[in-house]
């Protein structure tokens, strides 16, 4: 049995395909039961969010498990496997563990360090438990992953990494608008006369987890903001501009329900993608983060939207990879484009890189620890079987000896039987301890196999070791 993870995400598939691959909580149990009902899977967990659909499984064989999972994903998407295959990624054993740990820590998210994924992984695991399709290996894996995710967010500042990109982008946009639109500086929050730059610095610093009271003008006071995309980045952008004092905030998304959900959270209006051209014409700031495979806003469309606008400046903040906004819009009068490249220059990347590297180091350590424990657990049933076999031999031989030495009193018999047991324990101590040590190395399973062969141990030993049986292992 081995671990296998197969899926597609915002890096490997366009939004249209991710939407087809999405599985609701109501439909997930059937998908899970279909998976474990296949020939090569014994356990499964389905993680489906707006940016990824992934299946984690314990499989009997790699190729058989891969075929079963790929076929299921093809059925979910309604896309032939020949068309879907190029968008899938496959992780086996250690890489599957590392991938899950990276996902739950937010390293694989569009918005690096976002915490929403931790709750989504927890929900996926609970759903699999409720469907009774995971118990042993995957239960252990996901429980460990959730613990690792909590460590990442409590022991590092990874939460601020993605938030910094959004906040710095909004800060740059606010500076640009303030420089070209003095009329925006009309909404004092507390004390008049505060430098607008100080207000922006105070309001839009990376710590976005709690509201911040700001003295001075709101940096986006009265600004009309259009946000294209309703994922984690879009939602954070809506939160950020609201706290910066934006006036009318509009959320546009290809999925109306998702746009409405984000809009409701941040006192905004929801519109469809068809209304983008109209809303661009009204906006002072446009923030885009759709994850689309091509441009969402083109040069000609923006030029048409600017008609009748006069001298009012327009700022585009493109937070998408690949880019959403046509770079040629920079050529249009009154238009400023701030993209990822500009943000990388403006953002102090040293701390962000430090936080990401700290989490990667944590993931590496936790993956190694998980794999070591897993290899040791695989050996434990063999050690239990060996000690149980030895105990049975000792018991039978002592019973035979008792019939041959009937004149021994209880004290003498205790001495004899105790000596025999100690001799057997000492003989078994070195090989059982050593096989557990060797099991922690790559290929360690072969040593347990050799032990079974040498002592002719049964192969149907339990995969899950009971508490009394663990005593036999710990005695080594």
Swiss-Prot record:
Annotated NADP(+) binding sites = 229-234
GO BP: protoporphyrinogen IX biosynthetic process from glutamate
Q: Which UniProt keywords apply?
A: NADP, Oxidoreductase, Porphyrin biosynthesis
Cleaved signal peptide residues: none
Output the superkingdom of the source species: Bacteria
Q: Which reaction does it catalyse?
A: (S)-4-amino-5-oxopentanoate + tRNA(Glu) + NADP(+) = L-glutamyl-tRNA(Glu) + NADPH + H(+)
In the Enzyme Commission scheme, what number(s) does this protein have?
1.2.1.70
Q: Tell me any Pfam family this protein matches.
A: GlutR_dimer
Q: What class of enzyme is it?
A: oxidoreductase
The record's section on PROSITE patterns has: GLUTR
Site feature Important for activity, where: 99
Entry keyword rRNA processing: no
Q: Which Gene3D superfamilies match?
A: Glutamyl-tRNA reductase, N-terminal domain (3.30.460.30), NAD(P)-binding Rossmann-like Domain (3.40.50.720)
Q: Which residues bind substrate?
A: 49-52, 109, 114-116, 120
What GO terms are given for molecular function? glutamyl-tRNA reductase activity; NADP binding
Q: In which pathway does it act?
A: Porphyrin-containing compound metabolism; protoporphyrin-IX biosynthesis; 5-aminolevulinate from L-glutamyl-tRNA(Glu): step 1/2
Active site per database record = 50
Other known facts: During catalysis, the active site Cys acts as a nucleophile attacking the alpha-carbonyl group of tRNA-bound glutamate with the formation of a thioester intermediate between enzyme and glutamate, and the concomitant release of tRNA(Glu). The thioester intermediate is finally reduced by direct hydride transfer from NADPH, to form the product GSA.
| Function per UniProt | Catalyzes the NADPH-dependent reduction of glutamyl-tRNA(Glu) to glutamate 1-semialdehyde (GSA).
Tell me which family the UniProt entry assigns to this protein.
Belongs to the glutamyl-tRNA reductase family.
Q: Share what the entry says about its subunit structure, partners included.
A: Homodimer.
Q: Print the domain comment field.
A: Possesses an unusual extended V-shaped dimeric structure with each monomer consisting of three distinct domains arranged along a curved 'spinal' alpha-helix. The N-terminal catalytic domain specifically recognizes the glutamate moiety of the substrate. The second domain is the NADPH-binding domain, and the third C-terminal domain is responsible for dimerization.
What is the protein name given in its UniProt record?
Glutamyl-tRNA reductase
Query: Which gene is the coding source of this polypeptide chain?
Result: hemA
